[in-house]
């Protein structure tokens, strides 16, 4: 037999040891045959041995050796000689090989993973410091060619080709589920003391946390045509590859069809080449729910139906898929839901058609199906159906979908819980549904997801596997959207038992273990920021009365009047505010619970730690600064108490200045708003002026060509300078010394837009206050400024 009839493979074996054995006469059902028939059977056994041997060789790395036959050499010409490290758990668990009892293909390796660390459909954990990259392997063929010189199979990509990608190789990756983006809220109210409610990512801004593409790199020494990408173990941060559940379902049907086809072919038949792509998503063979028995499809049309379904989604349309949802066979229900999920991934017309075909109520009925695989695909399909489609969201709610989702959330299946929390997150982007979602879901979501996965009342460290982390991320994204709704919704969230405690506990634990860049931390801080919005106006009156404490008016000390023999400027009188703060601290609980966290002195330290330690996620630091801005805003006494606490005990000014130097416009809005509140309540404005003035002046524009921050940032900066100038000669002197006058005069005279009109009025007020320092008039004139520059229009 000529070796040229076979193409060797560069695919690695998944099992470290492979044993070979000839098929017995009993297996061939011809034991005891003699003469020419015996010779034919012996030849068949030899052929079977060669074929099995080639399977083994095809799964081992190729080494340099003797010259290959012409056919193999021609097929392997240009192949890369890269070395590949063995990844025992890096490939699909459905590897095909000859069994010892029958001629059908059976798995030869079953990687096992701890159920406590990964869901049955999550990515394989390579290690904490290793990730998969891809190396292009030139023209090497994949898998052994068919017996009797069948032509080589087409190259298989590094993952199964998506239904959306069949039109071209340059299409985008088909991810596990849609990457969820939250809603950006409009501008806040006219009251600029408060931080506007935390804004979410726009639909155009993708989140790198949810979706990871399988990167492909072509070797510069080989042609792209016919090339393959193989995973190679390299050092680096952990990464994930994700395939849509619909495509995984399709792969199961195809694999089962191949196995049954080979069994029907018999020993002398043509063996179908096994073409599968390397995969880092393992499907456990031990769970019968993952590998449905395709024999159940026989009652729906026999082998032709099986062949049509297992060939992929080409022969299925949306009406047929919706009909499959009503079938009694769970396999058909899975296939129908998988097709709907796949078709509605990014097709708005398909979502509309599915709603007209009554797919929504039929999927809702499957949320709590007895078969867990049906539940997963039904919720996965609904997750895509409601994404960016207000009509489908409303249809889901009208079909009692929220109740069914919360029932499904009680199941202890991570894949199902990921889908349910993802659906809730998608629903929460609709302003019309936020109040209803808050009323119906908050308590159960807190009890089932937030409290258990945040570490509240549990172990001292966060212990989440990858699936649980995604579930918690979805839940906090859902809360982030709800918290930007109405006052009633914010109040309901504040009063929900365990909700605020879970968020604070999670952030504290994340800081302790160095996970402050985590996207769930970002969501949690944004929720706290939104719940702090107009806090003193919306908090219970009894709590507000307790926070007001015993001020000077309660002590019977009118402003400016001496206490006993002390003059108005005496040290004793200056210490009264500090004493009052101490009395109020004694009245605040040292162990805050629930909404008490929102105004607790301890929360100031939490936000300060985030500002100091979070270096990469600017949304988290912006939210922390915004939350501090909210609780230090206004004329309430407690706002002043927390401002002085932040300045004097937490020493927050230096971290804020570090952020101001490098912040973008979004961060500057919150940072300067917070500094504005602190400057109004600071005791020592001279010290604050020395640290602040020069850095703030750098942010002001001085000419037409200079880059200018947004108008609200300009107004905040000028307001800070004004707060300092009216109380500190040091601030007035530094404004003159650091060329602040030139910039203020420029801002005052620039009135070419409504925003510049506002900043012009703020600059005019500051210049008028500067002119009150008579001792500086000579210096003003020396710099070329006149009285009209300060007091003129």
Curated annotation (Swiss-Prot):
Extent of the ARM repeats: 302-345, 348-387, 390-429, 446-484, 488-533, 592-633, 641-680, 685-726
Residue positions, PTM Phosphothreonine: 249
GO biological process: actin cytoskeleton organization; cell-cell adhesion; desmosome assembly; desmosome organization; epithelial cell-cell adhesion; epithelial structure maintenance; positive regulation of cell adhesion; positive regulation of cell cycle G1/S phase transition
Region (Required for interaction with SFN): 282-285
Keyword Cytoplasm in annotation: yes
Keyword set includes RNA-binding: yes
Region annotated Required for binding to PKP2 mRNA, chain positions: 513-793
Positions of the UniProt region annotated as Disordered: 56-82, 221-240
Modified residues (Phosphoserine): 122, 179, 182, 239, 282, 310-311, 328
GO cellular component, one term: desmosome
Residue numbers of Phosphotyrosine PTMs: 194
Positions bearing the site annotation: Interacts with SFN: 282
Compartment(s) of residence: Nucleus; Cell junction, Desmosome; Cytoplasm; Cell membrane
The entry's keywords: Cell adhesion, Cell junction, Cell membrane, Cytoplasm, Membrane, Methylation, Nucleus, Phosphoprotein, Repeat, RNA-binding
Residue positions, PTM Omega-N-methylarginine: 81, 260
Membrane association type: Peripheral membrane protein
Changes after translation: Phosphorylated at Ser-282 when localized to the cytoplasm, PKP3 at desmosome cell junctions is not phosphorylated. Phosphorylation at Try-194 by SRC is induced by reactive oxygen species and potentially acts as a release mechanism from desmosome cell-cell junctions.
InterPro entries in the record: ARM-like, ARM-type_fold, Armadillo, Plakophilin/d_Catenin
Region annotation Required for interaction with GSK3B: where it falls in the sequence: 291-720
Source domain of life: Eukaryota
UniProt xrefs under PANTHER family: PLAKOPHILIN-3, PLAKOPHILLIN-RELATED
Assembly, per entry: Found in a complex composed of CDH1, RAP1A and PKP3; PKP3 acts as a scaffold protein within the complex, the complex is required for CDH1 localization to mature desmosome cell junctions. Interacts with FXR1; the interaction facilitates the binding of PKP3 to PKP2 mRNA. Interacts (via ARM repeats) with GSK3B; the interaction may be involved in PKP3 protein degradation. Interacts with hyperphosphorylated and hypophosphorylated RB1; the interaction inhibits RB1 interaction with and repression of the transcription factor E2F1, potentially via sequestering RB1 to the cytoplasm.
Function statement: A component of desmosome cell-cell junctions which are required for positive regulation of cellular adhesion. Required for the localization of DSG2, DSP and PKP2 to mature desmosome junctions. May also play a role in the maintenance of DSG3 protein abundance in keratinocytes. Required for the formation of DSP-containing desmosome precursors in the cytoplasm during desmosome assembly. Also regulates the accumulation of CDH1 to mature desmosome junctions, via cAMP-dependent signaling and its interaction with activated RAP1A.
Family classification: Belongs to the beta-catenin family.
The name this protein goes by in its record: Plakophilin-3
Organism field: Bos taurus
Lineage of origin: Eukaryota, Metazoa, Chordata, Craniata, Vertebrata
Gene expressing this chain: PKP3
């Amino acid at each position: 037999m000529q070796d040229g009839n076979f193409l060797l493979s560069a695919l690695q074996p998944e099992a470290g040891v492979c044993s070979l054995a000839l098929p017995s006469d009993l297996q061939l059902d011809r034991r005891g045959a003699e003469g020419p028939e015996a010779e034919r059977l012996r030849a068949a056994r030899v052929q079977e041995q060669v074929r099995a041997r080639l399977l083994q060789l095809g799964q081992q790395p190729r080494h340099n050796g003797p010259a290959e036959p012409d056919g193999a050499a021609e097929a392997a010409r240009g192949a890369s000689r890269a070395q590949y490290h063995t990844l025992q758990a890096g490939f699909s668990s459905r590897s095909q090989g000859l069994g010892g009892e029958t001629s059908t293909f059976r798995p030869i390796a079953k990687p096992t993973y701890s159920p406590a660390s990964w869901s049955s459909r999550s990515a394989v954990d390579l290690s904490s410091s290793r990730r998969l990259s891809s190396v292009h392997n030139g023209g090497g063929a994949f898998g052994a060619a068919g017996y009797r010189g069948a032509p080589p199979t087409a190259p298989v990509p590094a993952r199964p080709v998506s239904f959306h990608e069949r039109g071209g190789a340059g299409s985008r990756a088909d991810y596990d589920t849609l990457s969820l983006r939250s809603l950006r809220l409009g501008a806040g109210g006219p009251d600029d003391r408060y931080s506007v409610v935390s804004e979410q990512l726009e639909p155009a801004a993708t989140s790198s946390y949810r979706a990871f593409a399988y990167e492909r790199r072509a070797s510069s020494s080989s042609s792209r045509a016919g090339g393959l990408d193989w995973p190679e173990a390299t050092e680096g941060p952990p990464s994930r590859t994700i395939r849509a559940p619909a495509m995984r379902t399709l792969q199961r049907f195809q694999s089962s069809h191949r196995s049954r086809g080979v069994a029907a072919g018999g020993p002398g038949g043509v063996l179908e080449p096994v073409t599968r792509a390397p995969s880092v998503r393992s499907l456990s063979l031990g769970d019968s729910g993952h590998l449905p028995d395709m024999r159940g499809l026989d009652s729906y049309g026999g082998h032709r139906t099986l062949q049509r379904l297992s060939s992929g989604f080409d022969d299925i349309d949306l009406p047929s898929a919706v009909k499959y949802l009503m079938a009694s066979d769970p396999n058909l229900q899975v296939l129908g839901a998988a097709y709907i999920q796949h078709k509605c991934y990014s097709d708005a017309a398909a979502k509309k058609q599915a709603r007209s075909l009554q797919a929504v109520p039929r999927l809702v009925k499957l949320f709590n199906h007895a078969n867990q695989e049906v539940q997963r695909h039904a919720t996965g399909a609904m997750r895509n159906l409601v994404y960016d489609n207000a009509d489908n969201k409303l249809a889901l709610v009208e079909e009692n979908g929220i109740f069914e989702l919360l029932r499904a959330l009680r199941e202890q299946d991570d894949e199902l819980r990921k889908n349910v929390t993802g659906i809730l997150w998608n629903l929460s982007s609709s302003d019309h549904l936020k109040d209803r979602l808050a009323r119906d879901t908050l308590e159960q979501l807190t009890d089932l997801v937030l409290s258990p996965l945040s570490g509240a009342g549990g172990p001292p460290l966060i212990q989440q596997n990858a699936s649980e982390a995604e579930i918690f991320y979805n839940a906090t994204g859902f809360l982030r959207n709800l918290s930007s709704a109405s006052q009633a919704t914010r109040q309901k969230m504040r009063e929900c038992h365990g909700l605020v405690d879970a968020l604070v506990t999670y952030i504290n634990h994340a800081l302790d273990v160095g996970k402050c860049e985590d996207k769930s931390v970002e969501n949690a801080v944004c929720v706290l920021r939104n719940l702090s919005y107009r806090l003193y106006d919306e908090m219970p009156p009894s709590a507000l009365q307790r926070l007001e404490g015993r001020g000077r008016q309660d002590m019977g000390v009118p402003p400016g009047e001496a206490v006993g023999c002390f003059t108005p400027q005496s040290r004793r009188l200056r210490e009264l505010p500090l004493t009052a703060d101490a009395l109020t601290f004694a009245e605040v609980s040292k162990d805050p619970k629930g909404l008490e966290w929102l105004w607790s002195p301890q929360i100031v330290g939490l936000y300060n730690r985030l500002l100091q330690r979070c270096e990469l996620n600017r949304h988290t630091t912006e939210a922390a600064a915004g939350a501090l801005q909210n609780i230090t805003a206004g004329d309430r006494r407690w706002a002043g108490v927390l401002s002085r606490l932040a300045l004097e005990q937490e020493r927050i000014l230096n971290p804020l200045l570090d952020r101001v130097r490098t912040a973008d416009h979004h961060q500057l809005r919150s940072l300067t708003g917070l500094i504005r509140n602190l400057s109004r309540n600071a005791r020592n404005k001279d010290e604050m002026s020395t640290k602040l003035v020069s850095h703030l002046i750098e942010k002001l524009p001085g000419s037409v060509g200079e880059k200018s921050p947004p108008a609200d940032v300009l107004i905040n900066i000028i307001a800070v300078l004004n707060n300092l100038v009216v109380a500190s000669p040091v601030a007035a002197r530094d404004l003159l010394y650091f060329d602040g006058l030139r910039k203020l005069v420029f801002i005052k005279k620039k009135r070419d837009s409504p925003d510049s009109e506002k900043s012009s009025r703020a600059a005019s007020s500051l210049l008028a206050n500067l002119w009150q320092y008579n001792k500086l008039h000579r210096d003003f004139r020396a710099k070329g400024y006149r009285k009209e520059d300060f007091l003129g229009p």
